[in-house]
Amino acid sequence: MNKVQPIKDPEKLRQIQEDLATRTDPHGERMFLLFELGIHTGLRISDLVRLRKKHVCGEWIETVEKKTGKITRIPLNTTIRAIIQDRCRDMDDDQLLFPSRQRLGDGSQYSITTRCAYDDMQLIAKQYHLDGHIGCHTLRKTFGFWHYKQNKDLEMLRQWFNHTSQAVTLRYIGMDEEERRKSVQAFNPGGAVYHPRGTVYRGKPMQKSESLEIKNLDRSKQGKIWGSRAQQRRK
């Protein structure tokens, strides 16, 4: 089973935000608000889709987590508060932020499903060619990934997600993979220097002009030069 990934590319993340912000159709406006709330709060999709305007009017979101049954309080920064005020100004306090187009038998509204939110994320992943597996946890993980990148406070993030250990948090936000990737960027066990045409010369790297001089020779002469240098190194 593929592990759901955060959005790590800052350019793609910014592009998604800017493009969704310009959407004026109901579906696009819903996707924009859901996306921004997700990456600014780290709430699970199952909690986001149940939010009402009264939950997001102040400086904090206070809600009962569907998964754990615990009360959680999430601070809202000025950016997401401005978005909420702009997009929700005409809503009643008890109105759902993400209502389904369908109605219950008595005519009352209910929220979109997590499956609907997943489908929205798949549309985004396809349109912007996002790397890795994208799903409902992508927004929560994107929040965690960038919160850690900017603040470097793993313990705060662990408490935010209510994880049992910092190691769990690192794996969850994909930073364990990021650290592994960085660790091999300059990793070269044998110290080999690789030149054009796949030739390998151990030891002191050749000067650029010397490398080009050999490269421009035909293959038979290249082989003789490399062979003679290998013999010199063995002496």
Where do the language-model regions lie?
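C-terminal catalytic core of Y-nucleophile DNA break-rejoin enzymes
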Residues: 5-6, 66-85, 96-122
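Basic, Lys/Arg- and aromatic-enriched nucleic-acid-binding interface segment
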Residues: 6, 10-41
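DNA/chromatin major-groove-contacting recognition/catalytic segments
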Residues: 6, 79, 174-230
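Conserved tyrosine-mediated DNA breakage-rejoining catalytic core shared by Y-recombinases
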Residues: 12, 41, 50-82
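Short basic/aromatic active-site micro-motif
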Residues: 30, 131-146
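Alpha-helix N-cap/helix-start motif at helix boundaries, enriched for small hydrophobics
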Residues: 34, 42, 46-50, 157
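Active-site-proximal segment of tyrosine recombinases
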Residues: 47-48, 133-134, 144, 152-163
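Catalytic-site neighborhood detector that most strongly recognizes the C-terminal catalytic loop/helix
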Residues: 67-69, 163-186
